[in-house]
Curated annotation (Swiss-Prot):
Phosphorylated by MAP kinases. The modification Phosphothreonine is found at T114. This is Profilin-2. Binds to actin and affects the structure of the cytoskeleton. At high concentrations, profilin prevents the polymerization of actin, whereas it enhances it at low concentrations. GO terms for molecular function: actin monomer binding. Its main location: cytoplasm. It comes from Olea europaea. The variability of the residues taking part of IgE-binding epitopes might be responsible of the difference in cross-reactivity among olive pollen cultivars, and between distantly related pollen species, leading to a variable range of allergy reactions among atopic patients. Keywords: Actin-binding, Allergen, Cytoplasm, Cytoskeleton, Disulfide bond, Phosphoprotein. Pfam families: Profilin (PF00235).
Length: 134
C-alpha cells in the first residue's frame, strides 16, 4: 500500500458512525521532515515547525510555553502521551500527532469532528505502523 493510500483510506476516511465527517487535513512525514504523503488541505509547514515537534517528543513539555506551530497556525498544547502523542487545540479545531519508529502521523480537525475522533483515527494508524516496524 502506498503512503498516499494510508492518508486517503485511513486518515481522511469517513468517521465511524458519522458518514461525511472526516479530518480537515492529514499527512505522514518522515522524522527528517520529508513528506511521505499528505491530503490536499495539509498546510505548508516550515522545517523549524517540524523540528519543534520532534524536540517535544524527545523533551516533553518543550512546546507548552510557546505553543505548537504548523503552517503558521498556533495550537495550544494539551494533554498528550509524552514521547508518543502530541495534541493541540485551536479554536473549535485541533491537531493530533503520533510518533512511530520512523514517521510522524498528523491529523487536523475542525468541528463537527471531535478531538476524540481525531485521536482515534491518527493513533490507530500510528499504532498499526508501529506494529509493522515503521
Amino acid at each position: 500500500m502506498s503512503w498516499q493510500a494510508y492518508v486517503d483510506d485511513h486518515l481522511m476516511c469517513d468517521l465511524e458512525g458519522n458518514p461525511g465527517h472526516h479530518l480537515a487535513a492529514a499527512a505522514i512525514l518522515g522524522q527528517d521532515g520529508s513528506v511521505w504523503a499528505q491530503s490536499t488541505a495539509f498546510p505548508q509547514f516550515k522545517p523549524d515547525e517540524i523540528n519543534g515537534i520532534l524536540t517535544d517528543f524527545n523533551e516533553p513539555g518543550h512546546l507548552a510555553p510557546t505553543g505548537l506551530h504548523l503552517g503558521g497556525a498556533k495550537y495550544m498544547v494539551i494533554q498528550g502521551e509524552p514521547g508518543a502523542v502530541i495534541r493541540g487545540k485551536k479554536g473549535s479545531g485541533g491537531i493530533t500527532i503520533k510518533k512511530t519508529g520512523q514517521a510522524l502521523v498528523f491529523g487536523i480537525y475542525e468541528e463537527p469532528v471531535t478531538p476524540g475522533q481525531c485521536n482515534m483515527v491518527v493513533e490507530r494508524l500510528g499504532d498499526y505502523l508501529l506494529e509493522q516496524g515503521l
